[in-house]
């Protein structure tokens, strides 16, 4: 059964799933699509063509789907936000809709945990199981791979790509691409080591060892792209392949490694 507070504004045309809860003074636009068992808390605003997956929660005064902060954007352009299942969007977070420079949509996968005051700009593409700590700020067109964690108070420059399973330390500033399964830190952030905590949670010891050897081979000495090409030869680990292909395809470059060679 839906529970909608009398003071909430639900525009005609909005699609609401089963057992939705919409609290006082919340706003849902006519083009929004809200999944089953979604909770929209007091004062939250769901705007434009926004889809929110089942079992998600949008906390007080978060704004999802407002127009992008892009001076080239024209309001007649179709745009919106697509969010997967089991998302948590905490207080005062802002997620802007996409632009014609992308496909018109900002996209976030399943199981996202977006903490208070985070900002996700237009056309960002976030994978599954993403965590953004308080005040993390993603500029336009940023891409985050699955299982990536971004620490609090960390801005990420537009068009940066962060690979799967990365950890970006709090109070860093990121302007270049980060290789999958790595930990980056600093202003400007550089790769320091493997994200050992993250990969040990997901992979067995043999795979962790393979990733550790690959990291040392890639970053210890020589040209990074040449190392990646050589490592790809006869490589059996799909995760090591992801690291190598990411290095070979980067457009913004990989930040200089300043860690210890003991990952």
UniProtKB/Swiss-Prot annotation:
Subcellular location(s) of the protein: Cytoplasm
Pathway: Glycolipid biosynthesis; lipid IV(A) biosynthesis; lipid IV(A) from (3R)-3-hydroxytetradecanoyl-[acyl-carrier-protein] and UDP-N-acetyl-alpha-D-glucosamine: step 1/6
EC number: 2.3.1.129
GO biological process, alphabetically ordered: lipid A biosynthetic process
The protein's enzyme class: transferase
Main location: cytoplasm
Swiss-Prot/TrEMBL catalytic activity: a (3R)-hydroxyacyl-[ACP] + UDP-N-acetyl-alpha-D-glucosamine = a UDP-3-O-[(3R)-3-hydroxyacyl]-N-acetyl-alpha-D-glucosamine + holo-[ACP]
GO terms, molecular function: acyl-[acyl-carrier-protein]-UDP-N-acetylglucosamine O-acyltransferase activity
Any coiled-coil regions, as ranges: none
Keywords, alphabetical: Acyltransferase, Cytoplasm, Lipid A biosynthesis, Lipid biosynthesis, Lipid metabolism, Repeat, Transferase
InterPro entries (alphabetical): Acetyltransf_C, Acetyltransf_C_sf, Hexapep, Hexapep_transf_CS, Lipid_A_LpxA, Trimer_LpxA-like_sf
Transmembrane regions listed in the UniProt entry: none
GO cellular component: cytoplasm; membrane
Annotated family: Belongs to the transferase hexapeptide repeat family. LpxA subfamily.
Function of the molecule: Involved in the biosynthesis of lipid A, a phosphorylated glycolipid that anchors the lipopolysaccharide to the outer membrane of the cell.
Quaternary structure note: Homotrimer.
NCBIfam families linked to this entry: lipid_A_lpxA, PRK05289.1
HAMAP family recorded: LpxA
Protein name per UniProt: Acyl-[acyl-carrier-protein]--UDP-N-acetylglucosamine O-acyltransferase
Lineage of origin: Bacteria, Pseudomonadati, Campylobacterota, Epsilonproteobacteria, Campylobacterales
């Amino acid at each position: 059964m839906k529970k909608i507070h009398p003071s909430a504004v639900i525009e005609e045309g909005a699609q609401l799933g089963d057992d939705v809860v919409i609290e006082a003074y919340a706003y849902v636009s006519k083009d929004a699509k809200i999944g089953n068992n979604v909770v929209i808390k007091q004062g939250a605003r769901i705007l434009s063509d926004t889809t929110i997956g089942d079992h998600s929660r949008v906390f007080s005064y978060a704004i999802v789907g407002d127009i992008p902060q892009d001076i080239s954007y024209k309001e007649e352009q179709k745009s919106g936000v697509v969010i997967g299942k089991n998302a948590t969007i905490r207080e005062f977070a802002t997620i802007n809709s996409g632009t014609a420079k992308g496909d018109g949509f900002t996209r976030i996968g399943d199981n996202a945990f977006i903490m208070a005051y985070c900002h996700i700009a237009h056309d960002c593409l976030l994978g599954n199981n993403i965590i953004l700590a308080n005040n993390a700020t993603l500029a336009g067109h940023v891409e985050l791979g699955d299982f990536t964690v971004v620490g609090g108070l960390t801005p990420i420059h537009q068009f940066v790509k962060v690979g799967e399973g990365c950890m970006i330390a709090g109070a860093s500033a990121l302007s270049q691409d980060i290789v999958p399964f790595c930990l980056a830190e600093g202003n400007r952030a550089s790769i320091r080591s493997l994200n050992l905590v993250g990969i040990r949670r997901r992979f067995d010891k043999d795979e962790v060892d393979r990733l550790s050897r690959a990291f040392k081979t890639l970053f210890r000495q020589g040209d990074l792209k040449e190392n990646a090409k050589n490592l790809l030869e006869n490589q059996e680990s799909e995760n090591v392949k992801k690291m190598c292909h990411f290095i070979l395809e980067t457009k913004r470059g990989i930040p200089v490694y300043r860690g210890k060679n003991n990952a």
